């Protein structure tokens, strides 16, 4: 089949300019400073890989390229981050004390593979998707209507301004320990929040509320007839009707407080990030969120509908700043990692290895606890913890051919325990990995061939959907 227009635009546009900024270096007395303006990336914290960065500081500051993350498993987080327009500065107050700050004036959500492409995920993730199908909820007893409900997409607008952060770093020369303290005020880039609303008047015509009407001693048919025909059938074969609308929202005004520590110990560069997020979006039960909100109550039924389903929901007024009916709370993630270099053992001549352990704790749900993710395989609640492990092992052989070095590229990422409270934070037993060979020619050109694989239970959650997408990739790169 053919790719849709959005897929062709994203996957076949030929190239793009990433970093494009102006900068200045100057001194004020004995204090050195650097300032950058326009499209660039800054990356605080110690996280190495994607899951670690999602839970740490770097993934909160930046959006990232999910297409590359899937195409090249094991990519370091800094290779996935995408630049946005911002103003940033680094001020070197002394040899040991550094202050950094930034203010962003461009917001961009994460880039995911478009629909109809090899790595495309659930269609509902795309803003151009037209229908979201729901099974009939137990809240509508006796309903004998279509097998699903289609809801029309209504896109939302997001603020490009308001994100900022500050970083204080101190290097203890005697111990070789660097300590950093962070504060970020940011907007989520991950699709954690979806809200929808069912048009109650339309729902009435297709029989949603028959049981509630009969409970009042009334005949639903004359009442339904007063509101005209049922909505047009979107799919005659499936009997789906469009009786509502939904949209994605990205939570604004999230607070992050963080500490990080880094030190070389025994030839290994160790890093630790401890963060606390307040007012952060949590993973939600999408079906329950959408089919438990209504607008356009028919006047004769308004009292009974309000008694059963609550007041009418202001769908159009909801956005990232006014974030109703989506779970929000506070979390405590921790990221611990290490990077080391391989020495000549006779089996290999050099190379590197890395590990990253991620822990996440759901401390408090401050809004929408009843709407937290709840499926047969994932059920979140306050006090839950999750863990995730990433490993990379890359031995190298030098001058295998004149000017050619070979490196074996291996990496894997797996959810060890539980499910993360935030989107893309990892799920138990779900993971991905890669094994391949990279040839570097004169340290300028490289060719990389890999077998990339995905594993874990076949489930509906994001991440498990790529279990059947194992592939072989070939990459050429030129360094300037």
Q: What is each model feature region?
A:
Residues 39-43, 103-109, 172, 183-189, ...:
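Transmembrane beta-strands of outer-membrane beta-barrel pores
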Residues 1, 33-37, 98-101, 177-179, ...:
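Transmembrane beta-strands of outer-membrane beta-barrel proteins
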Residues 467-480:
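Outer-membrane beta-barrel "beta-signal"
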Residues 1-123, 388, 417, 426-431, ...:
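Outer membrane beta-barrel
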Residues 19-21, 86, 165-167, 258, ...:
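Membrane-embedded beta-strand positions in outer-membrane beta-barrel channels/transporters
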Residues 2-6, 54-72, 115-152, 191-246, ...:
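Solvent-exposed loop segments that connect transmembrane elements
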Residues 23-35, 44-48, 96-99, 112, ...:
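Short loop/turn motifs that connect adjacent beta-strands in outer-membrane beta-barrel proteins
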């Amino acid at each position: 089949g053919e790719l849709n227009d959005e897929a062709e635009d994203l996957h076949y546009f030929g190239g793009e300019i990433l970093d494009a900024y102006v900068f200045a270096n100057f001194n004020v007395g004995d204090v050195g400073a650097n300032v950058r303006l326009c499209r660039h990336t800054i990356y605080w914290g110690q996280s190495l890989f994607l899951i670690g960065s999602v839970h740490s500081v770097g993934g909160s500051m930046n959006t990232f390229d999910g297409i590359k993350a899937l195409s090249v498993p094991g990519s370091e987080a800094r290779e996935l981050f995408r630049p946005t327009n911002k103003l940033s500065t680094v001020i070197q107050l002394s040899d040991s004390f550094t202050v950094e700050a930034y203010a962003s004036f461009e917001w961009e959500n994460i880039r995911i593979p478009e629909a109809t492409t090899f790595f495309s995920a659930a269609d509902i993730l795309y803003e151009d998707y037209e229908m979201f199908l729901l099974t009939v909820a137990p809240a509508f007893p006796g309903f004998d209507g279509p097998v699903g409900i289609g809801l029309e997409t209504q896109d939302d607008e997001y603020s490009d301004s308001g994100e900022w952060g500050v970083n204080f770093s101190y290097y203890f020369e005697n111990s070789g320990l660097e300590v950093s303290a962070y504060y970020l005020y940011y907007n989520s880039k991950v699709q954690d929040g979806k809200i929808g609303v069912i048009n109650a008047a339309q729902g009435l015509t297709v029989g949603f509320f028959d049981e509630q009407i009969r409970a009042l001693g009334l005949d639903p048919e004359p009442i339904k007839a007063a509101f005209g025909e049922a909505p047009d059938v979107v799919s005659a074969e499936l009997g789906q009707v469009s009786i509502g609308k939904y949209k994605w929202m990205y939570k604004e005004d999230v607070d992050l407080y963080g500490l990080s520590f880094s030190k070389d110990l025994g030839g290994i560069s160790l890093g630790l990030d401890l963060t606390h997020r307040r007012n952060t979006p949590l993973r939600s039960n999408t079906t329950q969120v959408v089919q438990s909100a209504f607008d356009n109550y028919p006047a004769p039924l308004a009292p009974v509908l309000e008694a059963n389903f609550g007041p009418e929901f202001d769908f159009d007024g909801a956005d990232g700043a006014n974030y109703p009916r989506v779970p929000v709370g506070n979390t405590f993630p921790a990221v611990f990692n290490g990077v080391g270099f391989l020495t000549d053992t006779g089996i290999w001549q050099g190379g590197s290895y890395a590990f990253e352990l991620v822990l996440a704790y759901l401390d408090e749900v401050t809004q929408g606890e009843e709407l937290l993710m709840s499926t047969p395989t994932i059920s979140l609640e306050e006090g839950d913890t999750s863990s995730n492990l990433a490993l990379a092992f890359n031995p190298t052989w030098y001058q295998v051919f004149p000017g050619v070095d070979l490196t074996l590229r291996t990496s894997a990422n797996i959810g060890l325990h539980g499910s993360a409270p935030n989107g893309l934070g990892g799920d138990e037993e779900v993971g991905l990995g890669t094994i391949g060979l990279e040839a570097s020619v004169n340290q300028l050109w490289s060719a990389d061939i890999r077998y990339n694989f995905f594993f874990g239970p076949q489930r509906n959650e994001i991440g498990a959907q790529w279990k059947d997408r194992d592939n072989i990739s070939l990459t050429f790169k030129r360094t300037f």
